[in-house]
Amino acid sequence: MGMMQEFKAFAVKGNVVDLAVAVIIGGAFGKIVDSLVQDIIMPVVGKIFGGLDFSNYYLPLNNQDISLTLVEAKKLGAVFAYGSFITILINFLILAFIIFQMVRMLSKLKRSEPPAEAPATPEEVVLLREIRDALKK
């Protein structure tokens, strides 16, 4: 079998195609969660804590003014952008929780499926067993 035929057989297998679809859907779902965190959750959290935008929280690692925005501060030197980290951490926790729930649901569905019936014993095997039993007598 040539290399191209082997690759085609590998690529067409269900698991590889399923994995590719999962990666694409996961990328799109990640963008939805990003939007959920940045556009809905973080503004509410910011409002609770006095209208602050967490994504602009940083500590300068040099002698620069802390009243600058994060983008301006990054242009002037190194910064410890802990607000951005908090936002990304919340994003990750939401995504991990949703994926955990999906895996949990799929496990329950798999457990509830009835086990597959064993294939019927081939007639040759049945015949050989009968011959064996007859010879034992």
From Swiss-Prot:
MF-aspect GO terms: mechanosensitive monoatomic ion channel activity
UniProt keywords (A-Z) are:
Cell inner membrane, Cell membrane, Ion channel, Ion transport, Membrane, Transmembrane, Transmembrane helix, Transport
- Where does the record place it? Cell inner membrane
Q: Does the keyword Plastid apply?
A: no
Q: Main localisation, per the record?
A: membrane
The regions listed as transmembrane in this protein's record are 9-29, 32-52, 80-100
Q: Report which superkingdom the organism of origin falls in.
A: Bacteria
Q: What is this protein called?
A: Large-conductance mechanosensitive channel
Q: Which organism was this protein described from?
A: Herminiimonas arsenicoxydans
